[in-house]
Amino acid sequence: MASQSQFHPRFQPRNLTPAGKQINLSKEIQSAFMTYSEVYSKTLLDYQKRWADVIFDLEEKSLRMDILKQLAELLKNKICYHPPMFVEQPDLARERDQRVFIYLSREKMQKVLEEQSITVGMEAVLATTIQPYRSDLAVQEMLRVHNRAWPHRRMEERDLECFIAIFASTLFIHLTTLKVTNLYGREVDCTFFVRRASTNRPYDVVAFGTT
């Protein structure tokens, strides 16, 4: 089982640093999402099926093995955004893809990329549908809606320097939908999702860059 895990395919996130023109950034992000869902996901699902077959062949009788076999049954048909591991609540793909963005400081982005994760330690993760290529939103407005959506952790300007793009898993729950006011005075809806604090685990990042 351990040797199988060594061959788990990892997606190489698209590096969009430094950010180019907004229209180019938009196209690059959409292309990265398409590559993940249309190319990489097939390779990943094939791996998960092979891993599941290995688990089903194990004869060990224990609660731990029961949980692993339940996970294996899920992963035969459902994309998981982290390698197969002993968890009762895996980060599975939703029935309908939800593309979201997590804003963070340069230092934090570097750390999560090194750890191939989306968290630093055990912390909640706030994600939003606000795209990083939107040039009509002021930094202060971005700060306002982020802090209103999740007041448990106050964000500062440096926390908006960078972004990572991901598919939200089934563990991301809808938090709120707020209105942001753009530079032209028009109100636009933006949605926030939160993934509650959990043990740190790997998670596939689709793209990353500066804002």
Curated annotation (Swiss-Prot):
- Cite the EC number: 3.1.3.48
Give the family this protein belongs to, as stated in its UniProt record: Belongs to the rolB/rolC family.
The chemistry this enzyme catalyses reads:
O-phospho-L-tyrosyl-[protein] + H2O = L-tyrosyl-[protein] + phosphate
This chain belongs to which protein, by name? Protein-tyrosine phosphatase rolB
Q: What functional role does this protein have?
A: Induces differentiation and growth of neoplastic roots (hairy roots). Seems to function as a tyrosine phosphatase.
Q: Which organism is it from?
A: Nicotiana glauca (Glaucous tobacco)
Q: Which InterPro entries match?
A: Glycosidase (IPR006064)
Pfam families according to UniProt: RolB_RolC
Top EC category: hydrolase
What terms describe the molecular function in GO for this protein?
protein tyrosine phosphatase activity
Superkingdom, natural source: Eukaryota
The UniProt keyword set, sorted, is:
Hydrolase, Protein phosphatase
